[in-house]
């Protein structure tokens, strides 16, 4: 399983290539295979970096250290491409990205996904779904799933917003507002 964070952590002192090589080799060993030679790994990494439109210079930079939001998300999508999990949870991968960066992220996820990888995309915006058509759409409000449907539900939410959902589930909407108020209070007191 792979988890893509809304706000990826910076890890100074660990460069991207070394982090990915160690992760990749750990996965190989876990699957009963031998570790890959560093030169062979570099070839695989270079190819995957092209797949996610990432400049090779990022191999030597520390993991997410000083990266822009778009660079962090691309680095995370590169990790997803290299590790090829059976299932991935992408938590607001589009958060803080401009329209071009969201498009690149969406296209990259579509290129590396496939029938052998389940992906749960958590998003507030439909643009990330342009190249990743959902089989199922679930709406979470107040900490619970209140409505489910297919891609048409995602399209409806994009066009009409969440007002219908909030009105249809007033208890969940009230719980959501209370959770938001608590988060704001925590932010101002910390």
Regions found by a protein language model. Name each.
Residues 5-85:
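ABC-family P-loop ATPase nucleotide-binding domains
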Residues 86-92:
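Walker B motif beta-strand of ABC-family P-loop ATPases
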Residues 92-93, 100:
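Walker B catalytic motif
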Residues 98-103, 148:
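Conserved D-loop-proximal element of ABC-family nucleotide-binding domains
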Residues 102-115:
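Helical segment within the ABC ATPase nucleotide-binding domain
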Residues 116-132:
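Conserved H-loop
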Residues 140, 144-167:
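Conserved beta-strand-loop-alpha-helix hinge in the C-terminal portion
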């Amino acid at each position: 399983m792979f988890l893509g964070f809304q706000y990826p952590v910076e890890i100074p002192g660990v460069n991207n290539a070394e982090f990915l090589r160690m992760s990749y080799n750990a996965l190989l060993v876990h699957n009963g295979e031998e570790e890959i030679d560093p030169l062979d790994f570099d070839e695989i990494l270079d190819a995957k970096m092209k797949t996610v439109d990432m400049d090779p210079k990022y191999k030597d930079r520390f993991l997410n250290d000083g990266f822009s939001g778009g660079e962090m998300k691309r680095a995370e999508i590169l990790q997803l491409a290299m590790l090829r999990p059976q299932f991935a949870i992408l938590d607001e991968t589009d958060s803080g990205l401009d329209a071009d960066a969201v498009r690149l992220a969406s296209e990259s996820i579509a290129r590396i996904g496939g029938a052998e990888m389940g992906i749960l995309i958590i998003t507030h915006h439909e643009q990330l779904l342009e190249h990743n058509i959902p089989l199922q759409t679930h709406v979470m409000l107040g900490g619970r799933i209140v409505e489910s449907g297919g891609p048409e539900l995602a399209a409806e939410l994009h066009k009409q917003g969440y007002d219908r959902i909030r009105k249809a589930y007033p208890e969940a909407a009230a719980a959501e507002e209370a959770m938001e108020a608590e988060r704001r209070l925590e932010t101002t007191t910390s």
